[in-house]
Amino acid sequence: MKNLYSLRRFYHVETLFNGTLIVGGRDQESTGFAWWAGNARLINLSGKLLGAHVAHAGLIVFWAGAMNLFEVAHFVPEKPMYEQGLILLPHLATLGYGVGPGGEVIDTFPYFVSGVLHLISSAVLGFGGVYHSLIGPETLEESFPFFGYVWKDKNKMTTILGIHLVLLGLGALLLVLKARYLGGVYDTWAPGGGDVRVITNPTTSPAVIFGYILKSPFGGEGWIVSVDNMEDVIGGHLWIGLLCVFGGIWHILTKPFGWARRAFVWSGEAYLSYSLGAISVMGFIACCFVWFNNTVYPSEFYGPTGPEASQAQAFTFLVRDQRLGANVGSAQGPTGLGKYLMRSPTGEIIFGGETMRFWDTRAPWIEPLRGPNGLDLSKLKNDIQPWQERRSAEYMTHAPLGSLNSVGGVATEINAVNFVSPRSWLSTSHFVLGFFFFVAHLWHAGRARAAAAGFEKGIDRDTEPTLFMRPLD
């Protein structure tokens, strides 16, 4: 097939270390890309590109399985997951596997099974990747036309998009199936401190589900990150699953409209840029979810959120000083505001001190102590349960702090155990990777648009000093 880009521009980009190293269809002269450009050499070799993608999937699944078994091997049931640096077992626990009331791990065998299944799957994918990379046909169009494609074929591209959407939708519906019929999922809001619960009545109201989409991302609104009950979570997956399945079927059966054909760039690099942009957005959303949300990411497994840890400290000292005789309803702090309790801007009774900034935090261990107007003084005096005290004391000392500035009043101790919360790891990694993927999106989008417009801006390589230097070997 004729190349869709100019080879001339690439000839002077890179001098091969070994000019005699030639692999059919994968050398610099025939593809315009040097060895380090990776899959770019396979742009027009659909069979080999399939091998690269299957092998990549195998590597991903291998990591998941190996890391899963590593975490199982190192897991200590007596300590909370977030104290052990775990990031995979909390996800399995959130799905309701191996845990009971209060998030206590009662069986690690499901975690072992998960790891083994992923390892076996990775072996199958790895074999497929090696086969298609080395043995299988270089292009699929002739032998397997259903799996073959041409990047410019708009109808085929939207068919592939549709297949992907159907698979994503089925994945979302699998969670609905697990929550509704296959044992339930962990609900941190279950009475008494969380438990595995079958979600018998997921939210189906479009006003509620799409209301999250229409909310502001700022302040106390929080967009979709503000979801605070499992009914809405599972109902949202039901909606998104059905939309993806039916949207996928639509894209399989139809051809793109004229406005879509004109609006988009239809090339392999353009599709790469669209994908990178989408993954970037998902990375940023995941960052916010794991940092702020304690429903989808239960604190029993991931540790408390920052505001939750700050509120937990205020609660812990209120409990202590109340037992020592303090009148927590009227005691003044050093600023003249309430030391333990004060009023929010809208009149609710909230915790006093520096944690006042987090007055609208919601957490399962504190909600039972609220009344119609914020914290209930009578409940604080008479109804505090031991599990609430234990949990808040634990959360107070495991804040996801990694900042050099204010920490919401949480006491920091230079001699403390070196603790980094999984929330810190996961939110930071997803933010950083989301940013990198966004830059990659801009890079490939710019190249794709330039190529489509008939020009590619870049450094003039004809006078590159490197070209006149003696090769290192």
Swiss-Prot record:
- Kindly state what the record says about how the cofactor is bound: Binds multiple chlorophylls and provides some of the ligands for the Ca-4Mn-5O cluster of the oxygen-evolving complex. It may also provide a ligand for a Cl- that is required for oxygen evolution. PSII binds additional chlorophylls, carotenoids and specific lipids.
- Name one cellular component (GO) term: chloroplast thylakoid membrane
Q: Which GO terms describe its molecular function?
A: chlorophyll binding; electron transporter, transferring electrons within the cyclic electron transport pathway of photosynthesis activity; metal ion binding
Topological category with respect to the lipid bilayer = Multi-pass membrane protein
Show the stretches that span the lipid bilayer: 69-93, 134-155, 178-200, 255-275, 291-312, 447-471
The main place the protein resides is: plastid
Cross-referenced Pfam families, in alphabetical order? PSII
Residue runs in coiled coils: none
Subunit details: PSII is composed of 1 copy each of membrane proteins PsbA, PsbB, PsbC, PsbD, PsbE, PsbF, PsbH, PsbI, PsbJ, PsbK, PsbL, PsbM, PsbT, PsbX, PsbY, PsbZ, Psb30/Ycf12, at least 3 peripheral proteins of the oxygen-evolving complex and a large number of cofactors. It forms dimeric complexes.
Into which family does the record put it? Belongs to the PsbB/PsbC family. PsbC subfamily.
NCBIfam families to which the protein is assigned, alphabetical: psbC
**Described purpose of this protein according to its UniProt entry:** One of the components of the core complex of photosystem II (PSII). It binds chlorophyll and helps catalyze the primary light-induced photochemical processes of PSII. PSII is a light-driven water:plastoquinone oxidoreductase, using light energy to abstract electrons from H(2)O, generating O(2) and a proton gradient subsequently used for ATP formation.
Query: What protein am I looking at?
Result: Photosystem II CP43 reaction center protein
Question: Which species is this record about?
Answer: Nephroselmis olivacea
Gene behind this protein: psbC
